[in-house]
Amino acid sequence: MVLDGYAVSIISWNIIDFGRTKDDQEIEFIASIVRDFDIIAIQEVVAHDPAGAQAVARLADQLNRMGASWDYVISDPTDSPSSQISERYAYIWQTNKVSLSYEPMLVDKLSGLCDREPYYARFTRDDKDYDILNFHARPHDRDPQSEVQALSNFIIDNQIRFNWILLGDFNITEEDEVWEALYAESFRPSLSHQKTTLKRACDEGLYLNVPIDNIYFSEVKNTVQQSAAIDFVERCENLSEMREISDHLPVSINLD
């Protein structure tokens, strides 16, 4: 839900295997979830097949048909150790709500330190900049902590001129000690103890698994009006079908 009076609303979503696996009905369903936000950040856009970029274009087209005016950008494939690991990122935004300041870019300085280097974009609203790093970490058993440490160092070294918003799928929780460097610089997670991934099957009526998707922001430069994980599953009977959309919940934040 987006409240009145906010400055900007952002939603981040790891949409599993976002490409030809998503039919028109699924694209329409995704659009119905993200349509009320100003900026949409997507992880796991398929890189090895043009259908990944085409899926982003299809989603933007569906959003435009819903009444607002939207634009989008898609990253190049990440500079990953293998083509199986490489992905694209995407941003989609409401053009009457925010403007894109310049061409987004993969952060080359982090390409040797992260399996999938983050995708940077600066959006502006009412003369305030929002410098977004869109990121998908390596799996939890392959040391995503070292990637987060590299991201933290990059943000801290460049924080004077930037209003960093770090978002995505980090494959670690907000309580991992690797975040302490950012927390010491007044960065905070938008969600706490909020599970954001889906189990393969319900367990005693429970289908949420681990809290690894989040949005990190500077509380010196921003005030959070609201943050949430959007549960599009709602009940166990829907789990199998909804996992075809994604095995992650989207996470959102409204900033003053």
Which positions does each model-derived feature cover?
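Metal-dependent phosphoester-hydrolase catalytic domains
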Residues: 48, 156-165, 172-256
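Extracytoplasmic mature domains of secreted/periplasmic and thylakoid-lumen proteins
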Residues: 75-119, 123-124
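Active-site metal-binding loops of divalent metal-dependent hydrolases
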Residues: 15, 44-45, 137, 169-171
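Active-site-proximal segments of metal-dependent phosphoesterases and phosphodiesterases across multiple
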Residues: 137-151, 175
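Sec-exported extracytoplasmic/periplasmic mature domains
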Residues: 35, 39-42, 58-68, 97, ...
